[in-house]
Amino acid sequence: MLLSAIRKKGFTLVEMLVTLTIVSILALAILPLAKTAVKREREITLKRNLRMMREAIDAYKKLADEKAFEFDEDTEGYPPDLETLVEGIEAKMEANEDNEEVTKVIKFMRRIPKDPMTNSYDWGLRSYQDDPDSDIWGGENIYDVFTKSPGTALDGTKYKEW
């Protein structure tokens, strides 16, 4: 009688092994899904960062085309580096009520974002004068940015081509 009461209180070794096997199989099935979710999140962050920097470059170019500030003609109106987009420029704004031209510092980005694929702040840069397929930056200006990651996205495209 005492022996049967002890058996009912605990698990047998077989029950523990079966439970451990089932949990292991479930964990192995979920692992690829978790890796895909992490990769997808990094891709979303990369797209967001690229879009933010490209919009900042476009805003800088628009002000240059409007002659709102002085720039070196060799740059074609594009920023000379990413730091310029963070530090900002002194732009001439519309006249105030005294018909005086007002100068204002305009910043295009708060900071240079981190590349989620390379985990660094080092981005691939392309100038207006560079070949569109070139990975080498001429240094004249910044026309476009891209990641330096050689990886392939979930949709099969190369990250460098984004």
Residue ranges with predicted function:
Residues 1-9:
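N-terminal leader/signal peptides at the extreme start of proteins
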Residues 9, 15-18:
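Internal alpha-helical transmembrane segments of multi-pass membrane proteins, especially GPCRs
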Residues 17-32:
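Alpha-helical hydrophobic helix detector
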Residues 29-41:
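Transmembrane signal-anchor/signal-peptide helices with a preference for the extracytoplasmic
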Residues 38-65, 77:
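Membrane-proximal N-terminal amphipathic helix
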Residues 58-162:
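Low-complexity, acidic interaction segments enriched in glycine
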